[in-house]
Amino acid sequence: MRVNITLECTSCKERNYLTNKNKRNNPDRLEKQKYCPRERKVTLHRETK
């Protein structure tokens, strides 16, 4: 079952990316290193509800 999720920057709290994930394979919150346009650098982005 794939669900749509939003990735939020951990340092500036801006929601920058929309993606999807398979809840059966990844039940935990997703964390990825992504580019933050506000800070102009790569930061950790976490899944939000």
From Swiss-Prot:
Q: Which GO terms describe its molecular function?
A: structural constituent of ribosome
- Record's keyword terms, sorted: Ribonucleoprotein, Ribosomal protein
The annotated regions of Basic and acidic residues compositional bias extend over 25-49
> Where is the signal peptide, in residue numbers?
none
Cystine links in this protein are none
Listed PROSITE patterns = RIBOSOMAL_L33
Q: Which family does it belong to?
A: Belongs to the bacterial ribosomal protein bL33 family.
Name of the protein in its database record: Large ribosomal subunit protein bL33C
Give the source species: Enterococcus faecalis (strain ATCC 700802 / V583)
Name the gene for this chain: rpmG3
